[in-house]
Curated annotation (Swiss-Prot):
GO biological processes: protein urmylation; tRNA thio-modification; tRNA wobble position uridine thiolation; tRNA wobble uridine modification
Localization, UniProt: Cytoplasm
Protein's recorded name: Cytoplasmic tRNA 2-thiolation protein 2
PANTHER family: CYTOPLASMIC TRNA 2-THIOLATION PROTEIN 2
Species of the source: Lodderomyces elongisporus (strain ATCC 11503 / CBS 2605 / JCM 1781 / NBRC 1676 / NRRL YB-4239)
A GO CC term assigned to this protein in UniProt: cytosol
Family stated for the protein in its record: Belongs to the CTU2/NCS2 family.
UniProt-listed Gene3D superfamilies: HUPs
HAMAP family in the record: CTU2 (MF_03054)
Annotated GO MF terms: nucleotidyltransferase activity; sulfurtransferase activity; tRNA binding
Transmembrane segments: none
Pathway(s) per entry: tRNA modification; 5-methoxycarbonylmethyl-2-thiouridine-tRNA biosynthesis
Biological role: Plays a central role in 2-thiolation of mcm(5)S(2)U at tRNA wobble positions of tRNA(Lys), tRNA(Glu) and tRNA(Gln). May act by forming a heterodimer with NCS6 that ligates sulfur from thiocarboxylated URM1 onto the uridine of tRNAs at wobble position. Prior mcm(5) tRNA modification by the elongator complex is required for 2-thiolation. May also be involved in protein urmylation.
Keywords: Cytoplasm, tRNA processing
Gene: NCS2
Length: 448
């Protein structure tokens, strides 16, 4: 039995008022307006801090209003979060004489390459649709559409050899023309690895954008269902040590600035957000933004880890076991910071900037058999000779050593194979807090 039911019987009263109920969720029945208030109440609970509330100041006093950056993907959850935040701002404005508790900036990171007319038109169309959407609200909302293009100065060819040593080499003259994130990801034969590396860049870009816009908070529309997928996906991709720091509301330090990361819908399931979108007439925009999203594979072997887990979670709903997602998230929230091996000092991954608590090279060498079985027959020796003459090691071991976590080693092996991948190194970005804009690894192309 599914978790959401439409009521066909007449005479059933809403749990909160005397209006006729139309929907049953979590064993409770709601009318349309009460259900919308139920969803909005969940967001307000997660963002109940005073910095998001209207402040009355004495004459002559000054106060800087909190700015909130909404990570907007165009999916159902981000559409609902935009609507909920905009409705909250409208309520604050009407109740408190045009005062607002915070300012809202909606940021969409376009996955087009930004190098040809078609991709530029795609970014322009996203901007137009977003402007049309925010125009429905009686509050001022800033919109930014950004295409992350990587400065070639910071790009390296990163490779991993059979002993799990990691190297970074300068690009050849032919490779220095690469500047688009889309170009780099298209070269990867493994969609899961591409998705993993893309997430790293997107998160860094959101932090950079929040800093440049003066935002002290980034909000994601992730539901409990999505957070459960993240817990499982991080574990599968070898990033289990990051679970505790990924799904919790937290504060991240970015170039000296403290930025809060919040998931206002962490107590709601995906189907509950989708029903809100249906009742609020937001699904038309979901269809409009879907045209510009990266298409999902329908073939199981080509699906990313996240796509497979999403399909798996849908089956939980159909079988009536969706509450398992809540259990997964609660277990993930209880995880703590890992301890370093033998009390050794921690260091950061040069790709994702996450802390490394145990050397992944030692672990991989311990669980991997690198020595072959002894050759017995002439046929086996002939096969070995054919392999050695045909196989060339394309990874240059003359480059500098780089520190990579287990997840990034796995992603690079999946994305680049024997030749490695072209990718920026976090340690190459030296930020001067006085002149931060001169040291951007990601160049911003924004349409306003």
């Amino acid at each position: 039995m599914k978790s959401l039911e439409y009521l066909t019987e007449t005479g059933i009263k809403c749990l909160k008022c005397d209006e006729g109920a139309i929907i049953k969720v979590r064993s409770d029945v709601y009318c349309k307006q009460c259900y919308l208030r139920f969803i909005r109440g969940k967001q307000r609970k997660q963002m109940s801090s005073d910095k998001y509330k209207v402040k009355y100041l004495r004459d002559g006093a000054s106060h800087s209003t909190e700015k909130v950056l909404l990570a907007f993907s165009g999916g159902v959850s981000s559409l609902v979060l935009l609507d909920v935040l905009a409705r909250l701002l409208e309520e604050q404005k009407n109740t408190h004489r045009d005062l607002q508790g915070f300012e809202l900036v909606v940021a969409n990171i376009s996955e087009s390459d930004g190098t040809n007319l078609e991709s530029l038109l795609s970014s322009s169309s996203i901007m137009q649709t977003l402007l049309e959407l925010v125009g429905n609200y009686e509050v001022s909302i800033k919109v930014k559409v950004v295409t992350p293009n990587i400065d070639p100065v910071f790009l390296r060819r990163i490779g991993v050899d059979y002993e799990f040593n990691t190297f970074a080499n300068n690009l050849s003259i032919e490779e220095q023309s690469v500047s688009s994130l889309a170009e780099i990801l298209r070269a990867s034969p493994n969609r899961s690895s591409s998705e993993d590396l893309r997430d790293v860049i997107f998160h860094q870009e959101l932090l950079r954008l929040a800093q440049s816009e003066g935002c002290g908070t980034i909000v994601y529309g992730h539901s409990m269902s999505r957070l459960a997928i993240e817990v499982l996906a991080l574990t599968v991709k070898g990033r289990g040590s990051n679970v505790h720091s990924t799904i919790l509301d937290r504060v991240e330090d970015y170039c000296g600035d403290q930025i809060s990361i919040i998931y206002p819908f962490r107590d709601l399931f995906e189907y509950e957000l989708r029903e809100y979108a249906v009742l609020s007439d937001l699904m038309q925009y979901e269809s409009a933004f879907a045209k510009y999203a990266v298409p999902k594979s329908k073939v199981s072997k080509n699906m990313t880890v996240r796509e497979i887990l999403s399909m798996y979670l849908d089956r939980w709903d159909e079988s009536g076991y969706l509450s398992t997602a809540s259990t997964v998230v609660k277990i993930g929230e209880k995880l703590t910071v890992p301890t370093s091996q033998n009390n050794s000092s921690t260091y950061c991954c040069d790709i994702c900037a996450k802390k490394i608590y145990q050397d992944p090279k030692d672990w991989l060498q311990m669980i991997t058999v690198n020595e072959p079985a002894p050759l017995v027959s002439d046929e086996e020796r002939d096969y070995l000779h054919q392999y050695l003459t045909s196989h060339t090691d394309t990874i240059s071991k003359s480059g500098e050593h780089v520190n990579l976590c287990y997840g990034c080693i796995t992603a690079i092996n999946g994305a680049g194979g024997d030749s490695g991948v072209i990718w920026p190194l976090q340690k190459d970005v030296k930020f001067d807090h006085g002149e931060k804009e001169k040291a951007k690894v990601l160049k911003e192309y924004s349409l306003e």
